[in-house]
């Protein structure tokens, strides 16, 4: 009798989910303290005025204001939060 053992299932065919990185608040958007502005791996964007950086390089707002992106020395991109006057 000619028989053939059935093939086993492949050990491939899986992948991990995306990490949801990127810019969360774009330029001219309003933020409050603690808002995450960018989630990133490494410092593609650097912290500027009124923002902090977490241990996983997440950039977050320290004050209420408006997000502003600018180019600095050596073509680095900095993220600032510019405080808006509450008098208006």
Curated annotation (Swiss-Prot):
Keywords: Ribonucleoprotein, Ribosomal protein
Coiled coil: none
Keyword set includes Ribonucleoprotein: yes
Cellular component per GO, a single term: ribosome
Highest taxon listed in the record's lineage: Bacteria
Segments of this protein annotated with the region Disordered: 1-24
Compositionally biased spans, kind Low complexity: 1-13
Keyword Hydrolase on entry: no
Alphabetized Pfam families for the sequence: Ribosomal_L27 (PF01016)
GO molecular function, one term: structural constituent of ribosome
PROSITE patterns per the UniProt record, alphabetical: RIBOSOMAL_L27
Biological processes annotated in GO: translation
InterPro entries: Ribosomal_bL27, Ribosomal_bL27_CS
PANTHER family named in the record: LARGE RIBOSOMAL SUBUNIT PROTEIN BL27M, RIBOSOMAL PROTEIN L27
NCBIfam families, alphabetized: L27
Family recorded in the similarity comment: Belongs to the bacterial ribosomal protein bL27 family.
Protein name from the UniProt record: Large ribosomal subunit protein bL27
Organism placement in taxonomy: Bacteria, Pseudomonadati, Pseudomonadota, Alphaproteobacteria, Rickettsiales
């Amino acid at each position: 009798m000619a028989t053939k053992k059935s093939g086993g299932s492949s050990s491939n065919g899986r992948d991990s989910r995306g990490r949801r990185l990127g810019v969360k608040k774009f330029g001219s958007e309003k933020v409050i303290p603690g808002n995450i502005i960018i989630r990133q791996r490494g410092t593609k964007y650097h912290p500027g005025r009124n923002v902090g950086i977490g241990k996983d390089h997440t950039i977050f707002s320290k004050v209420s204001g408006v997000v502003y992106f600018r180019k600095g020395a050596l073509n680095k991109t900095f993220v600032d939060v510019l405080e808006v006057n509450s008098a208006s």
